[in-house]
């Protein structure tokens, strides 16, 4: 069977992290999201895997996924339905959205054995944010209702389908949606009127990485469930390690450092002297956390450096960021209300009382910079010394206030 991973989306909701990488390459501990998907497909015996990408990101995917077929979605039409039109299969195929993390392959291995079309559903606590599955009295799909104000159930579309080539007939029958996209779910709703579409409920951990703080959520789950304590690096005397801590190859932990797990320290990272890593610190690879730096519940990506006298809490920092001395990220409002973040032009609540900042790749801050809760700083931005960053900063912007 063929499998198609739909990864042509712009990743706008995950900005500024996606200013410099497709969302399929958001890291989960040491591996990008898409590598977990490919691994699970191969465990189910699927070898013919194609990733549907945008023309903008094709070169990035080809460089990173050398053994996987890469196909470009046409630029004139957006949406998951348009991505399927770029896929070519004559019999049947497995379709997976490229921004999903799921904890095991069991239901995928199950769904590909079915004779009929099928969709995987998953139960969530916030169904009105997703497409909700409506079932008939035989537990087959009746229809998918997108983001209903009053959801009929908490079983939602998990973004994993097994479809035969009839789907192309139904894609030809639908129109562009109100948001300007050709929607795969519209075609599936038509298909469900004519053919049985079986619903399989997913029972493991599932996460749609659709908002910047979901990067923290999924990494926390992975740290709790996918790895075990190990030390493959070099730890100097007078280092205190407490709880579950993973130290990868060529990492160096210098004297006076206190590490309170669970913590993940990626390959080639340098910690200390006298650093404090608190629970759910994830350092992806070749990071530097220097003297008198405290990090808590944050994902810090490849090559980023926080050399001295800084605090980072509940934040996501993309690759090759460098903080000047005394850079502080605040993660709690004075009124202790939930932190709001601008996502795709709308200011929404994160549902978190503690949330720091989201820093794009290659950002530089001067000394004594303060960044307020929920702020996003675009890739390649420069923050001048002494600035208090109280609003979002754009891609490449120089912020002086």
UniProtKB/Swiss-Prot annotation:
Entry-linked CDD domains: LbH_G1P_TT_C_like, NTP_transferase
Coiled-coil intervals: none
Activity control mechanisms: GlcN-1-P acetyltransferase activity is inhibited by divalent cations. GalN-1-P acetyltransferase activity is enhanced by Co(2+), Mg(2+) and Ca(2+), but inhibited by Zn(2+) or Mn(2+).
Outcome, altering residue 308 to A: Strong decrease in GalN-1-P AcTase activity and almost loss of GlcN-1-P AcTase activity
Manganese is among the record's keywords: yes
Cofactor(s) the record lists: Co(2+); Mn(2+)
Catalytically driven reaction(s): dTTP + alpha-D-glucose 1-phosphate + H(+) = dTDP-alpha-D-glucose + diphosphate; alpha-D-glucose 1-phosphate + UTP + H(+) = UDP-alpha-D-glucose + diphosphate; N-acetyl-alpha-D-galactosamine 1-phosphate + UTP + H(+) = UDP-N-acetyl-alpha-D-galactosamine + diphosphate; N-acetyl-alpha-D-glucosamine 1-phosphate + UTP + H(+) = UDP-N-acetyl-alpha-D-glucosamine + diphosphate
Enzyme Commission number: 2.7.7.24, 2.7.7.9, 2.7.7.83, 2.7.7.23
One Pfam assignment: Hexapep
Keyword Manganese: yes
Pathway: Nucleotide-sugar biosynthesis; UDP-N-acetyl-alpha-D-glucosamine biosynthesis; N-acetyl-alpha-D-glucosamine 1-phosphate from alpha-D-glucosamine 6-phosphate (route II): step 2/2; Nucleotide-sugar biosynthesis; UDP-N-acetyl-alpha-D-glucosamine biosynthesis; UDP-N-acetyl-alpha-D-glucosamine from N-acetyl-alpha-D-glucosamine 1-phosphate: step 1/1
Region described as Nucleotidylyltransferase: 1-220
Entry keyword set: Acyltransferase, Cobalt, Manganese, Multifunctional enzyme, Nucleotide-binding, Nucleotidyltransferase, Transferase
InterPro entries the record matches: Bifunctiontional_GlmU_arc-type (IPR023915), GlmU-like (IPR050065), Hexapep (IPR001451), NTP_transferase_dom (IPR005835), Nucleotide-diphossugar_trans (IPR029044), Sugar-1P_NT/AT (IPR053650), Trimer_LpxA-like_sf (IPR011004)
NCBIfam families linked to this entry: Arch_glmU, Sug_nt_acttase_Thmprot
Job of this protein: Bifunctional enzyme involved in the synthesis of UDP-N-acetylglucosamine (UDP-GlcNAc) and UDP-N-acetylgalactosamine (UDP-GalNAc). It has multiple amino-sugar-1-phosphate acetyltransferase activities, including glucosamine-1-phosphate (GlcN-1-P) acetyltransferase and galactosamine-1-phosphate (GalN-1-P) acetyltransferase activities, and multiple sugar-1-phosphate nucleotidylyltransferase activities, including N-acetylglucosamine-1-phosphate (GlcNAc-1-P) uridyltransferase and N-acetylgalactosamine-1-phosphate (GalNAc-1-P) uridyltransferase activities.
Protein name as catalogued: Bifunctional sugar-1-phosphate nucleotidylyltransferase/acetyltransferase
Organism encoding this protein: Sulfurisphaera tokodaii (strain DSM 16993 / JCM 10545 / NBRC 100140 / 7)
């Amino acid at each position: 069977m063929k499998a198609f991973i739909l990864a042509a989306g712009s990743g706008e909701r995950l900005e500024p992290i996606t200013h410099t990488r497709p969302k399929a390459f958001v890291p989960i501990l040491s591996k990008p999201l898409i590598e977990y998907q490919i691994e699970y497909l191969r465990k189910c015996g699927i070898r013919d895997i194609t990733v549907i990408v945008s023309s903008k990101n094709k070169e990035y995917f080809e460089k990173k996924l050398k053994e996987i077929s890469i196909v470009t979605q046409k630029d004139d039409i957006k949406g998951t339905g348009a991505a399927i039109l770029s896929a070519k299969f004559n019999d049947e195929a497995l379709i997976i959205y490229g921004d999903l993390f799921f904890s095991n392959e069991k239901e995928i291995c199950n769904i590909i054995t079915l004779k009929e079309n099928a969709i995987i559903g998953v139960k969530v606590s916030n169904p009105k944010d997703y497409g909700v599955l409506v079932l008939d009295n035989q537990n087959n799909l009746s229809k998918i209702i997108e983001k209903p104000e009053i959801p009929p159930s908490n079983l939602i579309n998990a973004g994993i389908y097994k479809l035969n080539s009839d789907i192309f007939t139904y894609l030809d029958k639908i129109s562009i949606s109100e948001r300007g996209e050709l929607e795969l779910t519209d075609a599936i709703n038509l298909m469900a009127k004519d053919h049985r579409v079986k619903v399989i409920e997913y029972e493991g951990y599932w996460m749609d990485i659709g908002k910047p703080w979901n990067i923290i959520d999924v990494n926390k789950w992975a740290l709790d469930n996918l790895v075990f304590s190990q030390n493959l690096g070099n730890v100097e005397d007078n280092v205190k390690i407490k709880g579950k801590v993973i130290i990868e190859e060529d990492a160096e932990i210098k004297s006076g450092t206190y590490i309170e797990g669970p913590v993940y320290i990626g390959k080639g990272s340098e910690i200390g002297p006298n650093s404090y890593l608190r629970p759910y610190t994830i350092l992806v690879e070749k990071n530097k956390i220097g003297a008198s730096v405290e990090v808590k519940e944050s994902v810090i990506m490849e090559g980023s450096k926080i050399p001295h006298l800084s605090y980072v809490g509940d934040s996501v920092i993309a690759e090759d960021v460098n903080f000047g001395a005394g850079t502080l990220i605040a993660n709690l409002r004075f009124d202790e209300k939930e932190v709001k973040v601008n996502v795709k032009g709308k200011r929404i609540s994160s549902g978190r009382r503690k949330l720091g900042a989201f820093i794009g790749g290659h950002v530089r801050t001067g000394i004594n910079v303060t960044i307020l809760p929920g702020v996003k700083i675009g890739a390649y931005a420069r923050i001048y010394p002494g600035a208090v960053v109280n609003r979002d900063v754009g891609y490449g912007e120089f912020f002086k206030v």
